[in-house]
Structures are given as structure tokens and as C-alpha cells.
Amino acid sequence: MSKTVVRKNESLEDALRRFKRSVSKTGTLQEARKREFYEKPSVRRKKKSEAARKRKY
């Protein structure tokens, strides 16, 4: 869980920008989207193999 404390004399927009940056760095949002629905292990393996094939060519 990302946590951001608003500093003294810091605008809310700046704090929100720091929070968004920390969330994107940790990959929290991507992980939540990935785990939103159950994915069978066979489908997961298929996606992983397709991604590897895409990287190779």
C-alpha cells in the first residue's frame, strides 16, 4: 500500500502527483487490474508464452 504524507506548505496537487508516481513505481494498479478476475493457469501460461514470442520478434 502506497502512503503519501502531505508536507508542510505543499499543495494537494503536488501531493497527489507524488502519490500517483509512487503507485505507478510499485505497480500496485497494474497488479490490481491483473488480479481483478481469476485467470486459469493454462491461460496465464498462454499469455506468458505469447508475450515472450512478441518480445523475441
From Swiss-Prot:
| Sorted UniProt keywords | Ribonucleoprotein, Ribosomal protein
Q: Which GO terms describe its biological process?
A: translation
Compositionally biased residues, Basic residues: 43-57
| Any Pfam family matching the protein | Ribosomal_S21
Under PROSITE patterns, the record lists:
RIBOSOMAL_S21
Instruction: Read off the InterPro entries from this record.
Output: Ribosomal_bS21 (IPR001911), Ribosomal_bS21_CS (IPR018278), Ribosomal_bS21_sf (IPR038380)
Q: Which GO terms describe its cellular component?
A: ribonucleoprotein complex; ribosome
Disulfide pairings: none
Q: Which domain of life is it from?
A: Bacteria
Segments carrying the region annotation (Disordered) are 35-57
A molecular function (GO) held by this record is: structural constituent of ribosome
Q: Which family does it belong to?
A: Belongs to the bacterial ribosomal protein bS21 family.
What is this protein identified as?
A: Small ribosomal subunit protein bS21
**By which gene is this protein encoded?**
rpsU
